[in-house]
Amino acid sequence: MKQKNVETLNTMLQGLEAFQMILDKVIQEEQEAFDNLSESYQNSEKGEERQERIDLLQEASDNITEAISNCYSAIE
């Protein structure tokens, strides 16, 4: 791989890692807030929707982890 492309990817990966750190903080805060809600709210339709949104954010974070790993493997 051209050195210029490796440098571009490294810069992009730094940005993705920073984004993921922020995303993971949001996920943690949202999950803690959800966990502190009453069990009846958690089991309600709104509670289930809220947990689903948290799960979607976690899935996005997991996908970012995989993308970062794949990119690092590609430039090794």
Regions found by a protein language model. Give the residues of each.
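Long, low-complexity or tandemly repetitive, helically biased scaffold regions used
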Residues: M1-E76
